[in-house]
Amino acid sequence: MKKLLCAVLLSPLLYSNAVLADDAKQLRETLNGTESLKADFKQTVTDINKKVIQTGAGVFALAHPNQFYWHLTAPDESQIVADGKDLWIYNPFAEEVVIMDFAEAINASPIALLVHRDDATWSQYSVAKKQDCYEIKPKATDAGISSVNVCFNKGTLNKFNVLDDKGNQSQFDLSNQHSISAADKALFKFVLPENVDVDDQRLKSQ
């Protein structure tokens, strides 16, 4: 998730620009109704042959604007926290924390649309509706992801999947969805653990 990949352009024979624009508008309107969300997730990763190569579980949360929380609890623990300015990636096993500029880290992925509302970010992606799901594809050729599908049930995000350029697909099924509470807001504030190595990549880009 640290670096997400690729761009596959939609065929003009299948979708007109007007239809794509309308689908993007519908997705934006749906997301505008979700100022915050917290949920449990189960992750299933399959390869190009649809063989399961990994499963996992954890907790996921987001809040507008630009706040994100991801805590993988199994099989190996890891944590990603974005406070709107910085993004922190914590690997307890390696005792390492990587700090990145939020905009650079998130904007490379269609997942950015879940927390961004600005026109500039949305203009970087094509959106096509397929029943209760929306397929999002980056227009750039070096984005790091082929596509993301986000699906809703009665306006509530209930699953999404990420497809990379090697054909690997990560499916995330959500449960126990609810708006974040006042106490949950602490999730978006990363507390640096003691005795960990820190790789501050924000300094490298300055």
Swiss-Prot record:
Presence of the UniProt keyword Transport in the record: yes
Gene Ontology BP annotations: lipoprotein localization to outer membrane; lipoprotein transport
Coiled coil: none
Cited SUPFAM superfamilies: Prokaryotic lipoproteins and lipoprotein localization factors
Record's keyword annotation contains Chaperone: yes
Family annotation (InterPro entries): LolA/LolB/LppX, OM_lipoprot_carrier_LolA-like, OM_lipoprot_carrier_LolA_Pbac
Pfam family, one: LolA
Family of the protein in this entry: Belongs to the LolA family.
CDD domains assigned to the protein according to its UniProt record, in alphabetical order: LolA (cd16325)
NCBIfam families with a match to the protein in the record: lolA
Location relative to the cell: Periplasm
Function: Participates in the translocation of lipoproteins from the inner membrane to the outer membrane. Only forms a complex with a lipoprotein if the residue after the N-terminal Cys is not an aspartate (The Asp acts as a targeting signal to indicate that the lipoprotein should stay in the inner membrane).
Domain of life of the native organism: Bacteria
UniProt entry keywords in alphabetical sequence: Chaperone, Periplasm, Protein transport, Signal, Transport
The name this protein goes by in its record: Outer-membrane lipoprotein carrier protein
Self-association and partners: Monomer.
Signal peptide: 1-21
UniProt GO cellular component terms: outer membrane-bounded periplasmic space
Major place of residence: periplasm
